[in-house]
Amino acid sequence: VERTIKGIVVAGTHSGVGKTTMSLGLMAALRCRGLAVAPFKVGPDFIDPGHHAKVTGRAGRNLDGWMLSREANRDLFARHAAGADVAVVEGVMGLYDGYGGGDEAGSTAQMAKWLGLPVLLVVSAAGMARSAAALVQGFERFDPALAFAGVLFNRLGSRGHLDYLREAMSAYVDAPLLGGLLRDEALAMPERHLGLMTAGEHALSEAACHRLADHIESGLDLDRLLADLPDIVPADVEPVGCSISCFERVRIGVARDEAFCFYYPDNLDLLAAAGAELVTFSPLADNRLPEGLHGLYIGGGYPELHAAELAANDAMRRDILEASRAGMPVYAECGGFMYLCRELEDLAGEVHAMCGCFPFRTRMHGRLTSLGYREVRMTGPTILGGKDEVARGHEFHYSDIVDRHQWSPIATAYQVSGRSGGLAAEGYQVDRTLGSYVHLHFVSRPDCAAALVSSCRACRRERDQEEG
């Protein structure tokens, strides 16, 4: 008998309606009922999937209509929904918001149709009554091909407010009204400059998860939602496993702490499948790199918030610089790239010493300096692949390089274009150390993971020859 699961996409009419809180609450309520929940997030965001993982006990996975193809998204969904009872997909922005005004590309609606899942539409009822029915009717009719599981009102002023909304909805909207939740600011997730606080900074306690679950159960007809969701059979996918012999396996150190926490789990899975043993370490707390490494992966995060502590850890900075100079492959993205540079200047103008693998100083600004999807074409051989190989990712940061022009001998490794085109030189490689502001999703080019592991394997062989 084929195992079936149920799946739902949680979407909002627009950003700020409480979509993340509702998604987390739904995941928590389902788990409190004893159901295994597979969490997903539409878009390139790192923070929401971290909270999903805290609530569900399963890694939060990203689905994305630009970084990844339709087939890749469907494959990831099938692979990571397998074994769960319910898959919950948190949308991005408003339901129909995508890359442009002319079509659905990149939208939550597009992803829902790609996956064949119905939508639970979250609507903020604050300041609205009968007008809410007009709003929902517009969303319902905008794309007849999209299936709606129901509507959930958030931020009700009172239970009487919900009665008013129910009367209006029954007259004008086909999608079932599955409930409404009273305004509760205590449940809002705290934010900082890159969005919500990370799961590491604002860890949801077991008590907080139960509060979220109780909040959802108090106003959402979860029994009806589950009963009405169709049973789906996840598509068969090839298992991701490692067939590399132990003699060819390599150890890659992955930086994991409050300063470096932004990784797509699928990137790590692909590295493991290519033959890497992943060993976590903390540039903040550890004095030395783990023993026996053949490569390093330093992801993004918030080095600017921990710059003094990172600078004070001289031993770790020295270890990383020596590993880089010795030819160990080192790959760093965004915050990790900032850490590999010579210095980091914070918002107060204070300059902190970093690793020095690259000669640059990066400077924090009080505004975004870059945001958007990126396509990377490699201009020559790199530790992620050869000349003209292409991968996709995302860029989102408040810093930049302040002295790039002084270091013209440092060649760029990428030609980077945005979703709408335009080329810029970016990415920096010195020997086998590669750093960039772009967060790549390796599923857009799985060969990147294989190439990085291959570079680490070459490092291992060189070391073995020196020692032998």
Regions picked out by a protein language model, each given a short descriptive name:
Residues 2-115, 119, 123-150, 159-163:
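ATP-dependent carboxylate-amine ligase catalytic core
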Residues 7, 35-38, 249-251, 277, ...:
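Residues that mark the start of a beta-strand
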Residues 41-42, 177-185, 277-285:
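Beta-strand->loop->alpha-helix junctions that form or flank phosphate-binding loops
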Residues 112, 247-248, 260-272, 277-279, ...:
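C-terminal and late-domain segments of enzyme folds
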Residues 117, 175, 325-329:
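A short helix->loop->beta-strand "cap" motif at the edges of active sites that frequently abuts
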Residues 129-244:
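Internal gly/pro-rich beta-alpha loop/helix module
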Residues 249-325:
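Phosphate-binding active sites in nucleotide-utilizing proteins
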Residues 303-383:
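Cysteine-nucleophile active-site neighborhood
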